[in-house]
């Protein structure tokens, strides 16, 4: 008997690593974008958790009045945040080695920049990883295009807006109440509710929720029954089956009669494209709106635009909103400036026309 031995060429360690990274047989696909994503998101997550729990107060306004954001300094889950870096730092890149000491780095809010920059690189890489996996599986690339909407939104509030305003202290705090504070101040300074791109974003988010609920309920209501009355209809579907699991003709007929004929889709592909495109385009517009308002191209101003025949102002909801904006602007950064710029820039209102005569 003859035994034939084939010599197996052992691949180098680097080649094995390359094959593992790009293999679509792994339980979770890594990919080249994933290598960088794992490193940056781990760094951002670890720094965020440590800073949220134990970071000392940060001099966010650059006026030597630190703001506490961590749990160990009296906050809870709702009020806690990683406080943005100091206004004294501005737009300067502020890694640990740029500070004279670790205490100075913490006092000036260095962890905020560390978390934000690594987080943004991480989500960019996640988007690239979606494209990479689609490419290797022979799929079309639209999944990463859809994900670009939240990526654009995060980039707008964490990077574009601080650049436009001239300081990372104007970036969105990394916490729940800090996010709400950011929203209030953004409304006060930029009147975002009156910006058409924000309106398109609201239509995209709420409309997407409505269309998703409508689609899910129509499909669930028009399933092709494959089970008995005593079994769940969900058991009638087998993963990978070729047959349609619901009757699109029935769903089309129902919705066409409920609204009108042309409000209903008769093409499943165009329907699902619409379901994906509506919220994505809306969030794109909101991100674009925040990016333009970053450079103070603000929402519409219809203040005092309705006058009576005598020239007196008839207040509209725009005037009510303007009053709320001024109130919010007075409240924020109350120690950094004594008066909102909108009010301080106006003409002085006389409180007395003539000095009162005393003792005639």
Curated annotation (Swiss-Prot):
Residues given in the record as pheophytin a binding sites: 126
Record GO terms (molecular function): chlorophyll binding; electron transporter, transferring electrons within the cyclic electron transport pathway of photosynthesis activity; iron ion binding; oxidoreductase activity, acting on diphenols and related substances as donors, oxygen as acceptor; oxygen evolving activity
EC class name: oxidoreductase
Regions crossing the membrane: 29-46, 118-133, 142-156, 197-218, 274-288
Residue positions binding chlorophyll a ChlzD1: 118
Residue numbers binding Fe cation: 215, 272
Assembly behavior: PSII is composed of 1 copy each of membrane proteins PsbA, PsbB, PsbC, PsbD, PsbE, PsbF, PsbH, PsbI, PsbJ, PsbK, PsbL, PsbM, PsbT, PsbX, PsbY, PsbZ, Psb30/Ycf12, peripheral proteins PsbO, CyanoQ (PsbQ), PsbU, PsbV and a large number of cofactors. It forms dimeric complexes.
Functional description taken from the UniProt entry: Photosystem II (PSII) is a light-driven water:plastoquinone oxidoreductase that uses light energy to abstract electrons from H(2)O, generating O(2) and a proton gradient subsequently used for ATP formation. It consists of a core antenna complex that captures photons, and an electron transfer chain that converts photonic excitation into a charge separation. The D1/D2 (PsbA/PsbD) reaction center heterodimer binds P680, the primary electron donor of PSII as well as several subsequent electron acceptors.
Protein name: Photosystem II protein D1 2
Organism whose genome encodes this protein: Synechococcus sp. (strain ATCC 27144 / PCC 6301 / SAUG 1402/1) (Anacystis nidulans)
Gene name for this UniProt entry: psbA2
């Amino acid at each position: 008997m003859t035994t034939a031995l084939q010599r197996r060429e052992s691949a180098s360690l680097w080649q094995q690593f390359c094959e593992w990274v790009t293999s679509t047989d792994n339980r979770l696909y890594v990919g080249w974008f994933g290598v960088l994503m794992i490193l940056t998101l781990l760094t951002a997550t670890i720094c965020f958790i440590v800073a949220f729990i134990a970071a000392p107060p940060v001099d966010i306004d650059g006026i030597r009045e630190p703001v506490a954001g961590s749990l160990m300094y009296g906050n809870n889950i709702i009020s806690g945040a990683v406080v943005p870096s100091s206004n004294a730092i501005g737009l300067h890149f502020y890694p640990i080695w740029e500070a004279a000491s670790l205490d100075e780095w913490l006092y000036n809010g260095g962890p905020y920049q560390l978390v934000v920059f690594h987080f943004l690189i991480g989500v960019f890489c996640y988007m690239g990883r979606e494209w990479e996996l689609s490419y290797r599986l022979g799929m079309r690339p639209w999944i990463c295009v859809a994900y670009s909407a939240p990526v654009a939104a995060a980039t707008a509030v964490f990077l574009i807006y601080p650049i436009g305003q001239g300081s990372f202290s104007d970036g969105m705090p990394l916490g729940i109440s800090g996010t709400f504070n950011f929203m209030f101040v953004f409304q006060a300074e930029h009147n975002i509710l009156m910006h058409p791109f924000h309106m398109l974003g609201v239509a995209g988010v709420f409309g997407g929720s409505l269309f998703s609920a409508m689609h899910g309920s129509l499909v669930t209501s028009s399933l092709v029954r494959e089970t008995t009355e005593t079994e769940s209809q969900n058991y009638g579907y087998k993963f990978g089956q070729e047959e349609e699991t619901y009757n699109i003709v029935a769903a089309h007929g129902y919705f066409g009669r409920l609204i009108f004929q042309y409000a209903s889709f008769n093409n499943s592909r165009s329907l699902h494209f619409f379901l994906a495109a509506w919220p994505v385009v809306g969030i794109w517009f909101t991100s674009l709106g925040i990016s333009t308002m970053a450079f103070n191209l603000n929402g519409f101003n219809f203040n005092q635009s309705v006058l009576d025949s005598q020239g007196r102002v008839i207040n509209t909801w725009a005037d009510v909103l303007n009053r709320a904006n001024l109130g919010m602007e007075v409240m924020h950064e109350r120690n950094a400036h004594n008066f909102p710029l909108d009010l301080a820039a106006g003409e002085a209102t006389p409180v007395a026309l003539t000095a009162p005569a005393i003792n005639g």
